[in-house]
Every structure is written in C-alpha cells, then in structure tokens.
Amino acid sequence: MISNTVRTRFAPSPTGYLHVGGARTALFNYLFSKKNEGKFILRIEDTDIERSTKESEDQLINTLKWLNLNWDEGPIIGGDYEPYRQSERLEIYQRRAKELIEKGKAYEAYISPEEIEEVKNQLISEGKPPHYTYDLISKYNTKERIEEYNYKGLKPVIFLKMPQKDYELDDKIKGKVIFKKGSIGDFIILRSNGIPTYNFAVVVDDIEMKITHVIRGDDHLPNTLRQMAIYEAFEVEPPIFAHVSMILGPDGKKLSKRHGATSVEEFMVQGYLPEAVDNYLALLGWSHPEGKEILPLSEIIDNFTLDRVNSSPAIFDEKKLKWMNGQYLRNKPLEEIYQLAEPFVTGSKLLSKEQYEVNKKWVIKALETILSSVEILSEIPEKMEVFLKDVYPDTNDPEFKEYFDKRGVKEAINLIYKYFNEDDRWDTQTITENLKNAMNEANPQKKPFYMSLRKILTDSFHGPDLINTIFLLGRNTVLERLQRVIEI
C-alpha cells in the first residue's frame, strides 16, 4: 500500500458521451484510490465554452453513477477544494498566472492570434522550428500597443517561459520518457479572455487539489512536457504519472464507431450490466494475478496495482463483453432479472406494464426458460416473443414434411392433442407425463417427432426448452395449433 493520502482524479470535458477509453480511465483512477485507501476526485473541465454543455455534464455524472464509480469529492457532493468545475475557477487561474509573472517565469504579450500565427509562419519559412520565444513575442509589447489594449479594455495573453533543457519522466506504466531540450518553445497559459489553456488549468487544479497520481490515456503523454514545465515554474513536485495505452478494435485499429458501440451510454441502452462493464473495462490493460476473468469490483480493487497494467494497447472486443455480461446476468436471482428486464419488455410493446406485473409468475418462468441464450437485456423481448406471437407454420415446407412423415410422428401428435385436450391440468410435470405417454404408445422416431412438434407450436425447428415452451404457450394455444395439423 502506497499511503492513505493517495488522491486521484477523473477530469472529463462535458462535450459528449463517455466513451470506453474515458470510462476505463475513470475506473483505473477509482480502483487505485480505493486500493490505497485514498480519495477519488471528479473534476469537470468545461472551459471549452462552445462545446461544453450542462446536458453532457448531467449525462456524464449519471453514467459514472451507473458504473458505481462514486467520487469522494466533486460536483454535487462538494469537498475541501471546491469548486470542481473549471468554469467556476477562472479567478484562481488568473491569480496563479500573475504569480508566475511576478516570479519571472511567465510574461504578458499584447499580441493578437493572427500575429501569433504570423510569427509561426515566419519561423517555418526560415526553416526554423515554430517555437515562440520571449524575444519574438515581446517585440509586440510596444507602448502604443499597451495603451491601445488598455483603452479598448483588452487583456494580454500570458506566455510561460519554456526552459531549454531535457525533462525526464518516470512513468509508472511507460517507464522512463525523455523530452529533449528544444522540443517546444514558450506557450500560452492564459488567453486574453481570461480563460486558461488546458495544460495550465490542469496543473493548477492538480496542485490546488493535492493530486498525487495522474492516471490517464497515453494520448496525453505529449501534454506532459508542458505540464512538467508549469510544475517547475511553481516550484512544485509533479504528481506520479501513469499513462495507459490506447484501446484498439479487434482489427488493431483505433477504436471507433465501425467497431460497434463505443460509449457507455450505448451499453446502458442495450442492457449491459454495470458490474459486467466494470469487470471488462478493468481487463482492458490490467490483469488479475491469477488470470481470473469474472471479478466483482471489490476483488478488482483488492488486486489492482499499476505494475500489472500493460504498456501495450488493449483490444476491445464487444463479443467478449457480451459473453461476460451473460455470465453476470445468469448469476442473478430471477426476481432481480424480472426487475431489470421490465423496461425492455414493456418498451418493446411485447407486454404492457400492467400485463408484465399481473403475469409476474409467467414472466419469471419465461425469463428462466430463455436465460441460457440471453447475453444482454435488450435481447429478451425477441427471445420471449416465441411464447406470445401467433404463428401459422407452413405445413407444406419440405423439411417439415420430411420430419412429419417419419414413422409414428403423426400418430404421436394426434395422441398429444388427445391427452392435452382430456387433461385439465397444465403444469410442466403433467405436460412431461402426457408427452411420455404419447411417445410410448406411438413409438415415433424421436428427432423427427420433436422437430415436428416444435415447428407446429413455434414455427421453428429450434428454440428454448420444449416442455417449458409448451407450458408458457398455454393449453388453449397449444391445442389450437395442434388441431391445425392433426388432420394432415
């Protein structure tokens, strides 16, 4: 155990749905903080005013709650370092930027975005790296320009002075990473509208919120050089960094829509279980010491360490996730599955809410019957439909006729109709007895008989347990469908 002061954070931008990569980042931060008896902080990085929305933030929060990744500090619940939305922390960034100016680590620049672009293009035309320096930028800080800005109420941008030296990162997943001297030049930390750049806001927040470990996707690795320079300017020890490799599709290419569902919200809509999604996401890069795959969150927490996180890209396979979800689903009590399935069954109009509740025992029996073939909740209505839809099998179908014409099949079907019609009892035991009696008396070939019977009752040669199917169809329906063919 590292220490009980571990503080991790998940800091998403509320600009859309929470994708698989972001969800895994949140999960790894949550797991690491819980394993080390620390704190998991949620911070909303909403300084991109044009793209950030309250709706996206609400959706993000609901998704994290659904995943059971409950934060110790953050929006809604607050904490010692609030506010936890960057849009509410602008004064903090502005104050901290002025601190760096006073220390000589940063400088104001009375320069427009167009002029910054001109400086860049000029450097490129001269065959030089497009790196800004104080000498190049400060020449715009003329007395006339400063007076003009003051008169118009405009604010300067603030640049950080980038030290020209090597930076070394000891990444807990990637290992040693060297950022060579001269990789970048000076860079903006505060825009003229008072809004910080991403790297500056992140560092200020991580300092203020006492973040000890930054666990994030390796697409952020290039940002680390700028962030290390900002930490150095503040004379603050950087947190421990751990950059998790990207997630690829089964074809080895970057995960995208063409690989199927990529956002947690899509999994929610399709009827995945949060515990299955957590389990699967944890295995995208991390592995259990004993190679176990089906793991409750508590066991993942107990065994989670960064040294078991692979530095190679993880492969996202939705088929594997579906399989895992099926394992979790089949381990649940039928009463709980009944509750979980309700919005999917009633939402499909297969049954009304009232029908679902009034016929609870029947629904639970139907769920029990189809469960072995169900992996996600949204598959349930289609699987359950066999017990509810009316069917008129084509008795001229060549495959059906081949089965139906085999020895003893017609006679056995006639006998079943007779026994079911004469016996008022309707339960699986009675159905089994009557089937056995018909089989013993007519002695049909087994496979043709069962294939014919299933086709007559469900218009399919394959399906769930036949005895349960007959019971769930109901006595009247079974008699009606048998009657259609007993004269053939």
UniProtKB/Swiss-Prot annotation:
Gene Ontology MF terms in the entry: ATP binding; glutamate-tRNA ligase activity; tRNA binding; zinc ion binding
Keyword Protein biosynthesis found: yes
A GO cellular-component term linked to this record: cytosol
Keyword list, A-Z: Aminoacyl-tRNA synthetase, ATP-binding, Cytoplasm, Ligase, Nucleotide-binding, Protein biosynthesis
Catalytic activity, as annotated: tRNA(Glu) + L-glutamate + ATP = L-glutamyl-tRNA(Glu) + AMP + diphosphate
Name of a matching Pfam family: Anticodon_2
Motif, 'HIGH' region: chain positions: 12-22
Class in the EC hierarchy, top level: ligase
Gene3D superfamilies hit by this protein: 1.10.10.350, HUPs
UniProt motif 'KMSKS' region: location: 254-258
The EC number(s) this enzyme carries: 6.1.1.17
Residues binding ATP: 257
Main subcellular localisation: cytoplasm
NCBIfam families, sorted: gltX_bact (TIGR00464)
Family: Belongs to the class-I aminoacyl-tRNA synthetase family. Glutamate--tRNA ligase type 1 subfamily.
PANTHER family for the chain: GLUTAMATE--TRNA LIGASE (PTHR43311), GLUTAMATE--TRNA LIGASE, MITOCHONDRIAL-RELATED (PTHR43311:SF2)
Role: Catalyzes the attachment of glutamate to tRNA(Glu) in a two-step reaction: glutamate is first activated by ATP to form Glu-AMP and then transferred to the acceptor end of tRNA(Glu).
Name used for this protein in its record: Glutamate--tRNA ligase 2
Biological source species: Petrotoga mobilis (strain DSM 10674 / SJ95)
Gene that this sequence comes from: gltX2
